[in-house]
Amino acid sequence: MVSFDATEALTPYREGRGYGAILFDRERLRQADAGLFSPQRWGDRARPVDEGGRGGAWFVDAPFGHSVLRQYRRGGMAARVSRDQYLWKGAGRTRSFAEFRLMRELLKRKLPVPRPLAACYLREGLGYRAALLMERLENVRSLADHAQVAGRGAPWEDTGRLIARFHRAGLDHADLNAHNILFDAGGHGWLIDFDRGVLRIPATRWRERNLARLHRSLLKLRGNRTREDVDKDYERLHRAYELAWGRGY
């Protein structure tokens, strides 16, 4: 259950034949308009993010701080129908508003996630497009990068403990992969990309499903390393996870 937050602000807007709304953190943004979510509007201050994902993400040098802009994109077979349009089911169920509120709830629970700044949707007929703007984490590298460069020296145990912490809080991450786990030089870790994530009562089934997805992503990214090498590293991660889970953090 994501609680109400009085520091959120909501503003409607129209664009072309569509209409939408922007949900934003009024402690960080004095006002918000649709231009926040347009890389073209940012011009040279917006640079594409290369690693992971389906495109549609930019680093933005904004007056309110370094940020990341992500436009929601579909994958798989659904992308053949529409790359960036989703079926309208109500404002509260838009991908952007749901992720914005989930991230704010995780921050309230003292979990290491980027701070969301603003989310929007634009409805046209039965569909809508959406985008999310959040703080950028500085000087971090993904677990995918660590694994490819350092192999056995990657932060496997730290990753296991980090995931256990989120699972203890009830986060079911819909896309737990090696690109969505970040570490800085001091070993502090973060999770990112909470699209379709939900808070649940902790249960073995969904926790193991999250971990299995991460294992598959590590195998996919193994490069010249053998499957046996990857499995050994994952076992280190899993052991640390189980120990942290058993201790309650």
Swiss-Prot record:
It is an enzyme of class 2 (transferase). Its EC number is 2.7.1.166. It catalyses: an alpha-Kdo-(2->6)-lipid IVA + ATP = a 4-O-phospho-alpha-Kdo-(2->6)-lipid IVA + ADP + H(+). It is a peripheral membrane protein. GO terms for cellular component: plasma membrane. GO terms for biological process: lipopolysaccharide core region biosynthetic process. Catalyzes the ATP-dependent phosphorylation of the 3-deoxy-D-manno-octulosonic acid (Kdo) residue in Kdo-lipid IV(A) at the 4-OH position. This is 3-deoxy-D-manno-octulosonic acid kinase. It comes from Xanthomonas campestris pv. campestris (strain ATCC 33913 / DSM 3586 / NCPPB 528 / LMG 568 / P 25). The gene is kdkA.
